[in-house]
Amino acid sequence: MKGADGKFTPPFWPNNGVVPHTPQWRVSNCAIARLLAIHRRALGRAIAVAMEIRRGIDELTPLMAALCSRTCRFCPEPCCIGNTVWIDFRDLLFLHLLEEPIPPCQATSDPGDACPFLSHHGCRLPPRTRPWMCIQYICPTQRAVLNRRGRPTAAALLGKIEGIEKKRVRMEVEVVRRIKRRRRTSPSSSPASSG
């Protein structure tokens, strides 16, 4: 999205000063926003896949929230502290294609440090904005709960996760393919125009 200064600036999720904005994060996201804006007309299929992913995440969110409510508050080693997490390229493509708010910083932390978005009440980020690795993660305790509920429950949940993962790959492939195709056919990329 273009700001008042004419530069492409993605909508950043409200920070309220809790998590520091990093210049590199902002520059990287502005570059992605600019690239996608230039090619937006050719990205209809990728945007449609991103919308399917959003619907899948919206369906998955209450299921995962119910699972987390049974396990996370009792966990002696929360995954938000023990695991290294990051927002990957597909996460960013998804957010940018749908013009969803971008988290104020990368989610990475040093091993043993808590995720910068962890609060006393769980994740500060809205479910759609969270890294996919967080959305789809099922810890061993949660797997045990699912297995106690029976194979159909576990299979249905894992099937939803696998379906979203396949769509994430398809979305990325579609973006790369469309941008490559447009670059090959654009007049500015031809040898005759570079002289």
Task: Describe the residue ranges of each PLM region.
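Short loop/turn segments that flank or connect secondary-structure elements
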Residues: 1-194
